């Protein structure tokens, strides 16, 4: 269970921390959510060169388009006007590595002492208890410094900005297959029909809500049962 965190360079304040099974977009979106809701919009995020931050580190064969040089994380930053800078230079990681050493050493001991064994309980303890206490002990009071954070966006804006975008096509049954399930597009509770192979973009919001954009329209997605499940519910005459 890697621990990821963001640190305010000026005050050494941990502004976000999160446990996940591996370092992926999901974990970093949870970090981003903490920053946006608790502190506001930062001027700049400085990260390493891992793929979740730097699209150009992908093998060219795995890129969706040579013109698309932003990761989804980078796209979210752009939408909020945040500068995203990446680097592989080790000396730039000194503050984070020093903080992580103290951070993880104390955290592991506290999780053991409190009998915490699940990732959900670990995140609850990390966010609600450990980070506030850690900042009180080791960081300067960020409120005493001139803030470079802009006002927090609305929760709705955060929810739709921290989204996962996935290209799809409408099939012959006017449905979209997304992670093994079928969905159909609706607008104001009315089914909308499109030609087969129409390109679309599925939007999974931070809260799990699914939407789709088709022909510059934003539509709701409703789960559509697979045919074998549909046939089970037919009444035979």
Regions found by a protein language model. Give the residues of each.
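Short loop/turn microsegments at loop-to-beta-strand junctions
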Residues: 2-3, 172
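Short helix-capping and hinge/turn segments at secondary-structure transitions, especially at repeat
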Residues: 105-112, 116, 127-143
């Amino acid at each position: 269970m890697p621990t990821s965190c963001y640190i305010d360079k000026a005050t050494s304040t941990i502004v976000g921390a999160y446990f996940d099974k591996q370092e992926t977009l999901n974990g970093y979106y949870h970090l981003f959510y903490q920053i946006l809701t608790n502190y506001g919009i930062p001027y700049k995020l400085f990260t390493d060169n891992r793929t979740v931050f730097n699209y150009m580190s992908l093998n060219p064969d795995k890129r969706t388009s040579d013109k698309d040089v932003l990761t989804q994380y980078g796209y979210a930053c752009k939408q909020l006007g945040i500068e995203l800078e990446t680097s592989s230079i080790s000396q730039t990681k000194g503050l984070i590595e020093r903080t992580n050493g103290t951070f993880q050493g104390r955290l592991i001991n506290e999780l053991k002492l409190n009998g915490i064994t699940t990732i959900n309980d670990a995140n609850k303890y990390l966010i609600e208890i450990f980070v506030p206490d850690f900042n009180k002990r080791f960081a300067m009071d960020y409120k005493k410094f001139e803030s470079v954070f802009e006002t927090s966006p609305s929760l709705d804006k955060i929810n739709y900005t921290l989204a996962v975008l996935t290209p799809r096509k409408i099939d012959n049954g006017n449905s979209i297959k997304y992670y093994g399930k079928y969905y159909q597009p609706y607008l104001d509770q009315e089914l909308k029909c499109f030609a087969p192979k129409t390109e679309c973009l599925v939007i999974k919001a931070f809260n799990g809500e699914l939407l789709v954009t088709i022909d510059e329209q934003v539509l709701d997605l409703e789960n559509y049962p697979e045919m074998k499940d549909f046939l089970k519910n037919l009444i035979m005459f």
